[in-house]
């Protein structure tokens, strides 16, 4: 399986390439990508530099233009598609039908991948995107069970890519507008669950508080690790009980599922984390490269594949809340 790794900056891109990525994915420094954070992402000059670095080492490069344009901003998304095509990226990762349609019509030689933000959860949707836009691959949402992924793989007309490690989203990607209730912006339109301008951190007598547009999201005791302040992972007072009402901070880790994902025909596994540091990217990619190489070496006897304890420990140390989960892949309900 192909190892697809995050590149939120040029140093992170180098870290991914140097530690074994088969492919890296990046976004431009604007609202056209779903990791639009201050100080991250690429302008044209940095993108050219990153693409040259990756390609000189045999690594493919994908460009994520995976938010949903608003009427007044269509030209920004148009220009992003044109730039990606001009840079000759290996594929464009898109979600919006208008963006995919424009790319397919104006740049027919540009390979298209359906973003996880496209929320394709059944093979009829995959057929539609294949017929209308000739997509080559689809990234599946993180809300599907392994049985559902296997069913899709049997019928899909395109390659499938799944998330393997990183921040876990409990929503069906591309359909979450939760943060817009507080900030008037959402990851689907502006590229960030919690826009930096709305985030505030404050040391108080009760602990470190995180606020989103002045609404208290969480409070951390001394020595407690603070997480990224999103509404879905905040602690709330529910009938007198304060707890993570929607989701506890944790990270997806599917090392144990590598043989199963391989056997059902998954083409690529994706590491989430374009907002993460180069050191984070380097360590995660290194572990996943070792695991995939071991699985490949044992392809004739996949039952012998065993995850090394130090791999899991290394990933746990880098995870949100210092815990990991296999998420929806092994849920008992469908």
List each model region and its residues.
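Conserved nucleotide-cofactor-binding alpha/beta core module
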Residues: 122-125
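Contiguous mid-protein beta-loop-alpha structural module that forms a pocket-lining wall or clamp
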Residues: 143
